[in-house]
Amino acid sequence: MLWHYKISPHLSVITDSEPTMTNAVTAETANTNHTNNASSDKTQYQPQLIEAQQQAKWATDKRFEVSNEPSDKPSRYMLSMFPYPSGKLHMGHVRNYTISDVLSRYYRLKGYEVMQPMGWDGFGLPAENAAIANQTPPAKWTFENIDSMRAQLKLLGLSIDWSREFATCSPEYYQWEQWLFLQLYKKGLVYKKLATVNWDPVDNTVLANEQVIDGKGWRSGAMVEKRDIPMYYFNITDYADELLDDLDQLEGHWPSEVITMQRNWIGRSSGMEVHFPYELAGQSNSLDVFTTRPDTLMGVTYVAVAAEHPLAQYASENNKAIADFCALCKKGSVAEADLAKAEKIGMDTGLTVTHPLTGEEVPVWVANYVLMSYGSGAVMAVPAHDERDYEFATKYNLPIKQVIDIPAGYFDDVEEGNENCAYTERNTLVNSGEFDGMDFEQAFEAMLAKLEPQELAKKKIQYRLRDWGVSRQRYWGCPIPMVNCEHCGTVPVEEQDLPVVLPTDVVPDGRGNPLKNIPEFVNTTCPKCGNPAERETDTFDTFVESSWYYARFASPHDTTNMVNKSAANKWLPVDQYIGGVEHAVMHLLYARFFHKLMRDENLVSGDEPFANLMTQGMVLAGTFYRVNADGSTTYYFTKDIDIDFNERGQPIKAILKSDGQPVTIGKIEKMSKSKNNGVDPQITIDKYGADTVRLYTLFTAPADQTLEWSDDALKGPYNFVKKVWRIASEHIQALTDANLSLESLNSDALNTDSLSKEAKALRRKTHETIGKIDSDLGKRLALNTPVSSLMELANELSNFKASSEQELQVQHEALTDLLIMLSVYAPHIGEYLLEQLGLDTVTLNYPMVDESALVQDMITMVIQVNGKMRGKMDVAPNSDPEQLKAQARAIEGVAKFLTGEIKKEIVVPNKLVNIVVAG
């Protein structure tokens, strides 16, 4: 039986109680700790009621759904990296999706047609592990989690087009990556080969180098082994130059850190491939090595090969010690980082190769730091000029020959006992025969000129980047659409037979890939000869699904194309992509690669998938713990601790509620289950409301920097929202008392000719705020400073007391503009209050700056005497400097400091007058 799960109907939040603004009480009377109580007094700010009402309205109106049809509006595609459906949101999710939503709402107000979709990265090993633990199919676990997380996301008030939702574990999605795989296979961009891989013996799967930590599997913790297994590869190295060169297009649009990481990961280097001839079993052959330092070739004193290299295998055939050593080398990680830290060990094979320049015999060693999967599986060793080679040579007493001149005194500062004294810089060649006295470039060309005609060397460009092995020996993933036939070998599935559907009623037991034991899945017929055959049971690396999901959002339900070209042309590239920097060299590189693959299949246009990238900072929180008698550590949830804070809001004392005894206040660390310092967004939303949580996550720190979570600090944004509620309440009451209609206030032009000084100041602050927030969001991508600006404007509004109909109109303008801008960050209260003020929130635009409101009739200038402030004066802007000097000297509070001779008078236009007095 094959279960075909579909995403369940979307949840709608509705309320039978509508808050009102009539006779609203002040914010200060609301109880912070009881905002989730359904108070009978509807005049208080009750976020749960307002937010449920607004969310229900948005869902009913399908407010945020967008069409693929042409539009008069410019399009904008905003996307945060979609989540893995773990079942529960964390604060990192909240921050990530709030950033995207703020930008989405801002651009809608600016007149853009904005697409902000959401989907689910459904495949992956965590679902298998959960299925094993809970004895339930991963499909059931995954889709139940999707339902739960969708409901949580909706509580945040995100302006998502839910009609475009999909999960990557649905056949309707993954059939298209199977289709693309077949197209690439036809082109030779997919191939199968034996590969030495990191094998996790517990999870029974291949691990990428990045998933091996200190020689152990990142999830299971088991010691990793090396194994040779057949795997499918994407030929990403064919696109290495383009992937590297196109990073230039992203300069200024992506964080420089990410661009640098990708440049280093691709790692293009120019050098020379050198051939060391040898005779073996009567056959002539050569050991090929790549080097970026051919100038050191005369300093080669040994060569090192991987345990899997043919020379090492030949040497081990009749030598048990070498065979045992090669077997030892296969135990452990193939990750470069682990190899760099591991002790360098080796064994002399007894074989030699011929030095191409000197004709001397060079010993061949097998070494644990050489990988068969990197280059040719062999390196030339120059101990005098390479730190790793020096370490190895000194350990095994191998010759060290200096061939690069070392400046006098270069090693004078080396600490006593430092055994690594290799000189690795470029300089003039010495001890190199005919090449003595040459610099690097001269030696490169001279050696090439001598060796290339003999076919002993050639110029070569090499990459650190390796082809992408996408086979995974696990169940919960996209089936690879290939068949293994006894007669025909490896045969691709016919396109008309796609998708190859993954059985979904499987409960894995943790012992290998269960697909191998499902005859209904494995047994098939060969597409080529029709004889019985077996399906491939490996599944795709889950990075495959996440490498093209952004493009599928343009046409998520297209049944005839992987990506609809017309829809892709409207929406792609993604205008703003948001996610963690930890994805810099995996997901982001693979997505760039897939975009180029899809471009070459004429599915999308352009060279890059993401026009702009923001990497948001992590959410951190305090830790509280006790060290137990056995040395173990117990971490406690913040909710279980009573904390005393100092005046700066820093915790100074922590008591465990259950026993009244102190606990240690630990470091601020990334929220994690292991440290019990995570904060449940649901609890926080229930207490303060989603608008407050949204404001807090963006106000507290710049979006690209870490956020230190503090429950106590939530009260600041919460009090701000309550203040806005109070201001709106009092304003509506004032309009009622003055018998003014909202219709007239919203439509009549404001007469600014005879405004009071206070009214002009409020208008000026309003329009300064409009301009500043527009610049912060639209140009600087600064998401925290607009909240500060909104708070300042709210303070001005709170202090302003309208005493006439005209001033009420000024107040009304300021309040509506404040609410429009606030609705970007706190959409529930913002839109609710705008509706209370008679405005249609569907057709609202971002307010325009009235330049005339920024003109000041009078400005305040500071007066200094010898650099110290001694007074202030109100003057007309751009007043005559001589008049300003005279006016400043005449002020009584200033004159008493002018007893000495006036040496100089400095006027900084519209800012200050500084009088310099002798003595």
From Swiss-Prot:
Database matches in SUPFAM superfamilies: Anticodon-binding domain of a subclass of class I aminoacyl-tRNA synthetases (SSF47323), Nucleotidylyl transferase (SSF52374), ValRS/IleRS/LeuRS editing domain (SSF50677)
Ranges annotated as spanning the membrane: none
Record EC number: 6.1.1.4
Alphabetical UniProt keywords: Aminoacyl-tRNA synthetase, ATP-binding, Cytoplasm, Ligase, Nucleotide-binding, Protein biosynthesis
A Pfam cross-reference name: Anticodon_1
'HIGH' region (motif): residue ranges: 83-93
GO cellular component terms given for this protein: cytosol
GO-annotated molecular function: aminoacyl-tRNA deacylase activity; ATP binding; leucine-tRNA ligase activity
Catalytic activity line of the entry: tRNA(Leu) + L-leucine + ATP = L-leucyl-tRNA(Leu) + AMP + diphosphate
Motif 'KMSKS' region, chain ranges: 670-674
Primary site of residence: cytoplasm
Record: residues binding ATP: 673
Subcellular location: Cytoplasm
Gene Ontology BP term (one): leucyl-tRNA aminoacylation
Family per record: Belongs to the class-I aminoacyl-tRNA synthetase family.
Protein's recorded name: Leucine--tRNA ligase
